[in-house]
Amino acid sequence: MKIEYQETTNDLLARIDIHKKYGSRDIDQWILHLLDPQKGSAVLDVGCGSGKQCFLFYKVLEGDADITGGDVNRELLEKARQENAKIGNRIKLIDLNFNQRFPLNDDQYDLLTSCFAIYYSEDIPFTISEMHRVIKPGGRLFTTGPMPENKRLFYDIIYEATQLPIPPMPGSSRYSSQIFKAIQEQFLKVEVHIFENPLVFENVEPFLAYTRASLSEDRRLWKTLFEDTGGFEHVMQQINNVATQRIAQKGKLVMTKVVGGFIATK
């Protein structure tokens, strides 16, 4: 199934920044606690984007690891390459489309991560099989993605504002079902871990910034709500009205990110 999706650097980084400023928990520390990555490991991050996970592993392992990041988005990869240059290009960055055979050898990595990316695959079983192929026997796959109850407030406000059905999201609509099943079928065992991070907005501006970045980043997914810039701005004004009313009534907006972390062993 082809996913209509377009990711941009500015929108992605805006959401990451808002998570940091308004969330009460650090997902990076949660990931490190779960995985306990070891020095000397070979690590691959699939769908690495601007390199966030690669640089996290590089820092915590003090550079003592063979780290590779791959992505199909050239804009985000260029951002990663700019950051990589600052550390002497210690991370290998490659063009990698997870809808195609990975340009990598079998049994190569101790740890393969794919954070908030795998659900954009057009053929989930194929992508999982490629991940399985390049992981060493006994190695691990770690994926993250939104669970069905993720940021319920966000969708409730959009529905109240537009009175239009929320389109199915590639993540929350199939991460805990189709993707989890595909991983179970190909790996020896799978652990499920849940991360919850309440984002608290005491005024409407950061919530609107998050919403604007989300709708803009995923604009191909939201095409049933607006067709052009004028339609987008009209929807944003409707959302502004509803969000402002809710803050006036309750004093704040609390939007909880609910993320599933799957750890699979080959």
Where are these regions (language model features)?
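Conserved class I S-adenosyl-L-methionine
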Residues: 1-38, 52-56
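Conserved Class I S-adenosyl-L-methionine
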Residues: 4, 50-52, 173-177, 186-266
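Class I SAM-dependent methyltransferase SAM/SAH-binding core
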Residues: 42-46, 50-100
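A short acidic, Gly/Pro-enriched loop at the edge of an enzyme's catalytic core
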Residues: 102-111
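A short SAM/SAH-binding and catalytic strip from SAM-dependent methyltransferases
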Residues: 111-123
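Conserved catalytic/acceptor-binding region of the Class I
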Residues: 125, 140-203
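A short glycine-rich, Lys/Arg-flanked "PGG" loop and its adjoining helix->strand segment in the class I
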Residues: 125-137
